[in-house]
Amino acid sequence: MSVTIDPRRHDAVLFDTALNSTQALVRQLQQARVGTATFASGGGGHDAAIQALIESADRVGARPGRCVVITADAASVAAARDSGFALVIGVDQAGHRDALPDHGADTVLADLDEVRVRAGDRHMSELPDALQALGRPDGLTVPRPAVFFDFDGTLSEIVDDPDAATPTAGAVAALQQLAAQCPVAILSGRDLADVSQRVGLPGIWYAGSHGFELTAPDGTHHQNEAAAAAIPVLEQAAAQLRDRLGSIPGVMVEHKRFGVATHYRNAARNRVGKIAAVVRAAGQRDGLRVTTGREVIELHPDIDWDKGKTLRWVIDHLPDQRAAPLVPIYLGDDITDEDAFDAVGPNGVAIMVRHNEDGDRATAALFALESPARVAEFTGRLASQLSTLG
């Protein structure tokens, strides 16, 4: 069994000083521009273990929600889990393999040779501008595209209250122009009914809950039946999270049909670790998958399905590809959009909508846009370009 450290999701790795043979992995991480730091495990109790981890993350300038902890110490595993670290890897150096997952390890390895490091991605600041590249022979030219958009942070600005989000000025008109030229789809983490109502444009694809539920341009409804079995579990998890987190100012627990999103954008920064820890514990208890995003942590059915697989499913169900295959273009801003960036493949186009909430993180995207307003402008220009091609 192996585990992958992904620079798109992880800014730093914290190593227990008691671990053996860390040098080779440290070199791989440095080559991938992932920070590294150490902490001493053992002694001092639970609060001291948490403090040691937080101080180690601070030294490398990373927040716990984007840090990996690797340790052979069960107490350090528990401390990392309770303080909201993104990934907790246990290493069985002393024959106590069962104790590590019992304390909250995401995975347990025999040694560090089983750790992989994703390589080859660029950072957001290094990407060329998609608007400047559009239509240039050496830039971005796609004569037969199918264009996919995230909603929040891509077609809409990120706002403090998710219920207040609306498409940015000109976005819906540009989408309508584009839909007259090629297939268009909105892939959102929101409920299907929510995102389709906010955009309000007929004749395009809508996918809600990261693709667990879709409607086609003709109104045909599709859902992941395996995911539907988890709906009662998600309802129960939402109620329990409201009980556990509802008293924390600035936290909002949103129950969706195929997910539970805990928003903490308006919460105090020193409460975020606890919030994440509570959600991760709920996911582990209820057998649900945990995903993260911009100031949100979510629970989903534990099924191998994401925006990338949704994109490929939609492509496979689009008509009129006999003359030439459609080329996917995907525009998104968040970690969950990286699955779609991967899925467009070497012939597709992935476009990141830049932000600074995760620093200058790595991404699989090929191009970037500066804001949702630029997304609307790009969409309109792409529609005009396609109309001239006939």
From Swiss-Prot:
<dbReference type="GO" id="GO:0046872">
    <property type="term" value="F:metal ion binding"/>
</dbReference>
<dbReference type="GO" id="GO:0004805">
    <property type="term" value="F:trehalose-phosphatase activity"/>
</dbReference>
<keyword id="KW-0479">Metal-binding</keyword>
<feature type="active site" description="Nucleophile">
    <location>
        <position position="150"/>
    </location>
</feature>
<dbReference type="InterPro" id="IPR036412">
    <property type="entry name" value="HAD-like_sf"/>
</dbReference>
<feature type="binding site">
    <location>
        <position position="333"/>
    </location>
    <ligand>
        <name>Mg(2+)</name>
    </ligand>
</feature>
<keyword id="KW-0378">Hydrolase</keyword>
<dbReference type="InterPro" id="IPR003337">
    <property type="entry name" value="Trehalose_PPase"/>
</dbReference>
<feature type="binding site">
    <location>
        <position position="152"/>
    </location>
    <ligand>
        <name>Mg(2+)</name>
    </ligand>
</feature>
<comment type="similarity">
    <text>Belongs to the trehalose phosphatase family.</text>
</comment>
<comment type="function">
    <text>Removes the phosphate from trehalose 6-phosphate to produce free trehalose.</text>
</comment>
<dbReference type="InterPro" id="IPR006379">
    <property type="entry name" value="HAD-SF_hydro_IIB"/>
</dbReference>
<dbReference type="GO" id="GO:0005992">
    <property type="term" value="P:trehalose biosynthetic process"/>
</dbReference>
<keyword id="KW-0460">Magnesium</keyword>
<feature type="binding site">
    <location>
        <begin position="150"/>
        <end position="152"/>
    </location>
    <ligand>
        <name>substrate</name>
    </ligand>
</feature>
<protein>
    <recommendedName>
        <fullName>Trehalose-phosphate phosphatase</fullName>
        <ecNumber>3.1.3.12</ecNumber>
    </recommendedName>
</protein>
<feature type="binding site">
    <location>
        <position position="150"/>
    </location>
    <ligand>
        <name>Mg(2+)</name>
    </ligand>
</feature>
<dbReference type="InterPro" id="IPR044651">
    <property type="entry name" value="OTSB-like"/>
</dbReference>
<dbReference type="InterPro" id="IPR023214">
    <property type="entry name" value="HAD_sf"/>
</dbReference>
<dbReference type="Pfam" id="PF02358">
    <property type="entry name" value="Trehalose_PPase"/>
</dbReference>
<comment type="pathway">
    <text>Glycan biosynthesis; trehalose biosynthesis.</text>
</comment>
